[in-house]
Every structure is written in structure tokens, then in C-alpha cells.
Amino acid sequence: MFNKDEIIVPKNLEEEMKESYLRYSMSVIISRALPDIRDGLKPSQRRVLYAMKQLSLSPGAKHRKCAKICGDTSGDYHPHGESVIYPTLVRMAQNWAMRYPLVDGQGNFGSIDGDPPAAMRYTEARLTHSAMYLMEDLDKDTVDIVPNYDETKHEPVVFPSKFPNLLCNGSSGIAVGMATNIPPHNLGELIEATLLLLANPQASVDEILQVMPGPDFPTGGIICGSEGIRSTYTTGRGKIKVRARLHVEENEDKHRESIIITEMPYNVNKSRLIEQIANLVNEKTLAGISDVRDESDKDGIRVVLEIKKGESSEIIINRLYKFTDVQVTFGANMLALDKNLPRTMSIHRMISAWIRHRKEVIRRRTRYELNKAETRAHVLEGYLKALSCLDALVKTIRESGNKEHAKERIIESFGFTEPQALAILELRLYQLTGLEAEKIQKEYEELLNKIAYYKQVLSDEGLVKDIIRNELQDLLKHHKVARRTTIEFDADDIRDIEDIITNESVIITISGDDYVKRMPVKVFKEQRRGGHGVTGFDMKKGAGFLKAVYSAFTKDYLLIFTNFGQCYWLKVWQLPEGERRAKGKPIINFLEGIRPGEELAAILNIKNFDNAGFLFLATKRGVVKKVSLDAFSNPRKKGIRALEIDEGDELIAACHIVSDEEKVMLFTHLGMAVRFPHEKVRPMGRTARGVRGVSLKNEEDKVVSCQIVTENQSVLIVCDQGFGKRSLVEDFRETNRGGVGVRSILINERNGNVLGAIPVTDHDSILLMSSQGQAIRINMQDVRVMGRSTQGVRLVHLKEGDALVSMEKLSSNENDDEVLSGSEEECSDTVSLR
């Protein structure tokens, strides 16, 4: 049945399905559903356009059958059925779907009523000028070219993209676990915004809104209010209210009015809207309408809604907005691939990413032109040298037996290089005349000037920006058109989003692969110590394990620190809300500038930055630093440096100091602890390295927790095998910073090693989570205070092979009636995730 040389590797079915689905998911995300930030195209769109370019279907060329285009695309670049490729081509030709169509279609390409296009054997197409701008300079080594799927041809991984196509035409797509919906914009306004960011990379959203007030949909319509636009531009997500453009006309008898719809909201099917209105008229929801007619023609849309005599057109219009798609919400989600990673991006970051791409294109184009110019200049140098010794050169060539012999002789006799010798041998006699010699000299001098300019461009960032600026201004001069969508500002829509957010206590969880979510704290019932807990995280979602859990309020500020010592700033409500078993969303979608290998180390929630005290940072090798919290009040989007990290070290904790009475406690993996006043560490600058906080016992030891404590507190110390204890802070004698410290808990096979420690009172609860997703919330009244060197008690029963990975203190909330105390028996329905 099997060959003797075959090797069969047994695999767990569940693990194989999980890994295979993850690979499939990433394939859909990267290779199918999401556009590239650089050229705004999905792979299928890019391949269709490239196949059309290979067929020389430029704007001035004759249209070719779509069947030919789809066949070539399928056979050469996109190994899928032509019936899958044809809809991609059709959409790029529909002027109600694309703000700037990339394909010039001839024939029936569908309609805004949802009519299907004709079969591809009947329709024809060619490229538009917009598509040509995307592919301009493709032959000048401006982008990477890779083999196609069967390595018989080559295709570009991205287009040079002379304009920001992603924001011009927008994009929509559904991947696995994520979706994109980017609105289109006006090219002229977008160029103005790009020029603004070229001149001032730190320009604010308000400054961008002054030159680009919002999306510009191909179907026109009206955008109501600016808050949805502002949210979209700031966070990458927003809800934009879009209405049809309509007006009221008086009928000829002057006793009745008609509502006339002339422009549709984006992505609204006109025939379905008419059907929707007609159904509501029959149901008496829109009883004031007597007739619905579609009078649209080649000159434009005209939907007529006749109003009954005596009815108010204003009331009917408001009911149309409420009950029909005359008003819709465009849910913007500016998700695209940036460096092959899906990211939700602000307008600033999207434009900046295109500028970054364009800079690289210009540098590569300049290097190509430089190499070409230097090669030609080298040949011309040979020509000029040949003209200076023409008679001897001709004599040498005539005396040679063949071309190869002549090449060798002139190289040896006159010192020409091989490329120069070959070029001289291919010269025609008329090129040796005096007039041609002058042309050669002139061309050589021009090339020297070009070479100097190209080298200057490659060494001067300012010149690269000037080239981008000049190219954009040229596009603006020839392609600036009036916007189709108008924006009406509604005072009711312009309000702070936090006014409608409840400031409730939430739990923030971070999975092993850095997926984040927030949950109301009330989803976890309190249990007595030793309980089995409830499922706080679903391992079947593919997250691997739970890395961390934090508590906060929805309106708090989050300072997010990474192991590289970088700090990012977020509001809690910006994180996605999920159920207990939900996986959440990638934290990378919310943080810009995350580098390979960079992981979350600590999250600190801050109410405000007024008189906020100090931030205390600690690394796993025992280095500590104190810095004013005010230094972190306005981090940049790509984060700011919080601590200079030594090689082999990493940041593990960040704490908030608010009073002089507070002390610092450092706990180590092998059960040691040190306590000292925070005044022992002087305030430092944000980028300083820090000082020694604790001396570790050996190379296996490391700092696992840094806490700020007061004298009247106790400390809960938790080991990874589910055991722990409470000890009084005063039991840990105060020492100088940098010492080895004292024993905090006995380390043995039963307890395992120290996971962490948190200062607590009887009014606090603790939330423990294991690597297999088990969660338990324990009231501190159920854990008695013990001596410093004791073993502790069981806090949670863990399944075999499981271990605690995270702990977080939950302050009591008297208003939360749903946080109940329960017994161990009440939690017997814990789901097994093994």
C-alpha cells in the first residue's frame, strides 16, 4: 500500500485542522480578500490589469473580448475559473462602483439596478488612463517581479501606483475573522491631502479635513455629519451616514408634490429601493405616497414618489430616511495589508504608507535610470576615444581576420573595455562624420548631467519628495474634478463619542498570539478559593494560550508597554468587546509600529495625567527606573521609548506611584522579594537605562512582578501550580535597592515557581487564568494571611498539564449586583478544552 521509502508522520486531527484552517485563513487574508495599502488592489484585480497590459490594451488601443482577457489571466497568472475572474473585471469597469474605473468596458456591464452583465464572450474592454498611472514605470525595476504560479511567466507583487488608488477607489472584502470597507475619495482632494503630509508629516486630522472633507462616492449622495468621517480618519473605523439626493417638485396641477430622487447612496440597488418603498406603501408605513415610478434614463437617475394631496412632503421624507435605504450607514473599516500584515489604519497612516511606497519606487526607478545612463556614458566614452584615433583604429580593424579578432586587437592596442569595443565594431560609417561626433559629445555631456542628478536624488530625501510633489501636481492639473458627494454638517452628530459610553468596569485579555478583547467584569462570578473556575477563554478559537489579563474602566487611558521598552497609548473603549469565549482581534490592529519579536509586557490604566505622579518600570534582569508619568501623556502613534533595554533583557512591569509613602516590591521567579522606598530611585529621563533594583540568585532567576505597596496592605503571592498565600507587607523587611532580598514563599514541586504577586485587601478579588483558558475569581476574604516563609494554600484546582499564566486584582464594585458569590459545586459545569 505504501512505498518502503515513505515516512508517515502521525498527527492529532484537531491540531492538524486548527493549523490547516489557520493557513487557509492567512491565505485568504493575504492573497485574496484584502487590498495592498500601496496600490489598493487585491491579487485578482492586479492580475487582470497586468494581463491586459501584456495584451497591450492601452486606452488608445482597440477593445478586446473579455473572454480573451479572462482566459489569459486564468492561464498565466490567476489559476481560477474564468467565471470567478470575470466579475472582478466587470466591477473595475462599473462607474457606479468605482470612483475612477480602471477598465473601459464596451457592452453590457450591468447596471445600478443590479442587472447582471452580458456573458464575457459578448463584452470587450481595455485599460483606462487611471490603470495606466498605476502601472507606469513597471518596466523600470520599480517593484519586485516574481514567478507566476507555475513559473512559466513573471508578475509584479505590487504596482508602482502613481496615485493613492486605495483611497481613491476604496475597497471592500471579507476575509476570515476580519473585513475591510474603505470609502472612495476625490482624487484632487486626496492629492491635496498627500501634498499636505509631504510638507508636514505631523499634520493633524483637522488639517487633513480642511483639504479633504470626506469620502466622495461615485453615486453622489449626501453625507450627514462629520463625526463619522472624523472617527474613520482618526481610528480607521467609523459609521458614515449617507443619504440619497432628493428634492421636492410641484405637480402641474399645483395641488400635489412629488419627491424626486436623483442620486443614490453608495452600494444601494435602485430597483430594490423602489421595491422596498412600494412594499412600505402597501403596508401603510408610507401611506402618504400615491405612486412610485422609475423615470431613469441615459441622462441619469430619476425616481418619482408622488405624494397624496394634503400630505406633508417633509414628514414623508423623514419616514423614508427612517424606514428605507434612502438613508444608509456606511460602516468604514480601513483595513488593508501593510507589509503583508492586516492593519486597521488611520487616514494619516494610509497616506503615509503610500508616500513611503512611492519613495521606494522613485529610488528604484532612479537607480535603474542611473545604471542605464552610466552604461550608455561608458559606451560614448569609447566612441569619443575612438574618434581621437580613428585612422589607427580603422587600420587595426581592417587588418583583423574576423569580428572576434578585431575586438581583441582594439582592446589590447587602444585600452577599450569589451562593451566599448563591441559598440565600436557595430558603428555605421556615417556616425564617424564630424556632425555625428558633435552629437556624441553633446549626448555624453547630457548624460553626465543626468548621472549627477540621479546620484543626488539617491542621496537627498528632499529631492525624492520634490519628485513626488511634482508628479502629484501634474496629476492635479490634468485630472482635478468636482466632488460628487456633498457633506451636510449636523450639530446632533458632532459630539464626543465618550458621552454615549458607559464608564463600566471591564476585563482586558491578551492571548498568546496577541489577540485582545474586553469583557464586562460581571461575566465572572466570585468563587471561594479551591474552586474549578469557569471558561474565561476558548482555546478552540486558535489563540494557543492566554498571556495576560487586566482590569480597567472603559473611559480609562491605557499605557501599553512592550518587552522592547516601547510605550503606546489607547482608550479602553477602543478595544473590541467580546464574549467570554470570544478570541478578540489582533492587538497589532490598534498599535502602529510594532516590530518583529515585539510583545506586550504591561498595561497600565490611568484615569488622567493631571498631577499623576511617577511611572516605575522593571525588567526581568532586575533593572528599574522611575520617570514622571506626564512624560507619557501624548505618545506618538508609533509609540515612544519608555526604557533603554540592554541586550538579553526585556521590560516586564510598569507601576504607578502616586504618594511618597508608597514602597517598591520586586518578586523573583525563585521566590525572593525585595522592598525599598521609591525615593531610593531618582527620577530619570524617558530614554534612560535605569539602575539595579534587585540582585538575582542565578541565571535561572528573573523578576516576575514589580508592585507598589503601602504598610497596611498584604501581598498575595501566586505560584504557577495553583498555590499561593497572603503575607503582610511589613513581614518583608525594608532593604536598599539592589539587594538579593528575603524569601517570599517556599519553592518546591507542589507549588512550582512564582507567577507573580499583587498587593490586596479583604475588599479585593483576584482573577486567575490558566494556559488552557480556565478562569477563577477569588475574594481575598477567603484567603487568610500567613507567614512569609510558608508554603501557602491551594487557590485553584488545575487540570493535569495546566498551569497558571496570569493574575489580576479586581477592585470591589458595590453597584455591580451581578457579581455573586458561589460555591465550588456551582461551577461543576466547567468546559474541558483539552
UniProtKB/Swiss-Prot annotation:
Per the record, what is one GO cellular component? DNA topoisomerase type II (double strand cut, ATP-hydrolyzing) complex
The yes or no answer to whether the keyword DNA-binding is present is: yes
Q: Report the EC code(s) recorded for this entry.
A: 5.6.2.2
Family annotation (Pfam families): DNA_gyraseA_C, DNA_topoisoIV
| Positions occupied by motif GyrA-box | 527-533
Q: Which Gene3D superfamilies match?
A: 3.30.1360.40, DNA gyrase/topoisomerase IV, subunit A, C-terminal, Topoisomerase II, domain 5, Topoisomerase, domain 3
Residues annotated as the enzyme's active site: 122 (o-(5'-phospho-dna)-tyrosine intermediate)
Which InterPro entries does the record match to this protein?
GyrA, GyrA/parC_rep, Gyrase/topoIV_suA_C, Topo_IIA-like_dom_sf, Topo_IIA_A/C_ab, Topo_IIA_A_a_sf, Topo_IIA_dom_A, Type_II_DNA_Topoisomerases
Role description? A type II topoisomerase that negatively supercoils closed circular double-stranded (ds) DNA in an ATP-dependent manner to modulate DNA topology and maintain chromosomes in an underwound state. Negative supercoiling favors strand separation, and DNA replication, transcription, recombination and repair, all of which involve strand separation. Also able to catalyze the interconversion of other topological isomers of dsDNA rings, including catenanes and knotted rings. Type II topoisomerases break and join 2 DNA strands simultaneously in an ATP-dependent manner.
The miscellaneous comment for this protein is: Few gyrases are as efficient as E.coli at forming negative supercoils. Not all organisms have 2 type II topoisomerases; in organisms with a single type II topoisomerase this enzyme also has to decatenate newly replicated chromosomes.
Q: What is this protein called?
A: DNA gyrase subunit A
What organism does the record attribute this protein to? Chlamydia pneumoniae (Chlamydophila pneumoniae)
Q: What is the lineage of its organism?
A: Bacteria, Pseudomonadati, Chlamydiota, Chlamydiia, Chlamydiales
